[in-house]
């Protein structure tokens, strides 16, 4: 869900690849994300009632003082998304500047407020961040010329002509794009897909009447489904590792989650108003 619920890094990457507004992308992700959350809550509730799951986390009674302390501890980190989104939506700062504010704010909390980040840990975190950033920048440095070559060679127009020679059905072409993105999402990293296929698929989607923002959110929804689907199943493997659950035990129930998220993704593809509603009324 992180890829469509702001603030989302992959939305920023898509915006830089397509020329879309980062603020519009953030706004467009709220409604599809909310629909997905409601659908998954409904799915979990259905299976909990059907299977009679009565297991629950042990309840603890907190005093008013303890509740106030816990709320205070959680309040400062929870303010970070407000600073980021508020800065972007209000126009005070760009997405890049907002990310710098978030990093500085996190550093202050970790070092001076919670005092959990030592000098050695800071060096380790900084080194990992440099490696991650370097990988992303390397991908962008290769993908940007790739997109330029695609445009110079008129590849999107050739693809558009090819799809018209096969079918003129908007439904079939959108289904093809959705299935292609889902397939790519099963074995490729999301950012790589966004950077590589946006210059090719976005012009085709625009010939079908899809806006840049609508296509972007729809693409991220399809890639989210792919990240749950074998063989890679990045999100599923991560969840299994965190919860100490075997993959083959988790997958049967995950199939229902995949079907639910797929239905939400198809709904987002088919109904532009889901993504365009908030950006339109808040401009």
PLM region spans:
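Alpha-helical transmembrane segments of multi-pass membrane transport proteins
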Residues: 1-283
């Amino acid at each position: 869900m992180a890829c469509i619920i702001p603030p989302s890094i992959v939305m920023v990457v898509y915006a830089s690849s397509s020329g879309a507004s980062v603020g519009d992308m953030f706004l467009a992700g709220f409604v599809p994300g909310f629909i997905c959350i409601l659908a998954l809550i409904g799915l979990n509730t259905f299976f909990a009632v059907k299977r009679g799951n009565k297991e629950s986390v042990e309840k603890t009674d907190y005093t008013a003082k303890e509740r106030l302390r816990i709320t205070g501890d959680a309040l400062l980190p929870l303010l970070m998304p407000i600073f980021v989104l508020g800065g972007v939506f209000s126009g005070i700062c760009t997405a890049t500047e907002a990310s710098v504010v978030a990093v500085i704010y996190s550093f202050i909390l970790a070092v001076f407020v919670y005092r959990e980040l030592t000098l050695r840990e800071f060096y380790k975190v900084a080194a990992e961040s440099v490696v991650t950033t370097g990988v992303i920048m390397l991908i962008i440095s290769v993908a940007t010329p790739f997109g330029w070559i695609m445009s110079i060679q008129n590849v999107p127009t050739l693809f558009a002509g090819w799809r018209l020679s096969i079918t003129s059905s908007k439904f079939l072409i959108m289904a093809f794009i959705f299935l292609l993105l889902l397939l790519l999402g099963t074995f490729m990293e999301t950012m790589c897909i966004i950077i590589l296929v946006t210059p090719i698929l976005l012009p085709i989607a625009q010939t079908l009447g899809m806006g840049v923002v609508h296509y972007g959110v729809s693409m991220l929804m399809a890639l989210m489904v792919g990240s749950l689907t074998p063989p890679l199943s990045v999100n599923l493997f991560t969840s299994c590792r965190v919860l100490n659950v075997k993959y083959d035990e988790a997958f049967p129930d995950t199939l229902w989650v995949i079907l639910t998220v797929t239905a939400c993704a198809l709904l987002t593809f088919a109904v532009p108003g889901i993504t365009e509603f908030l950006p339109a009324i808040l401009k």
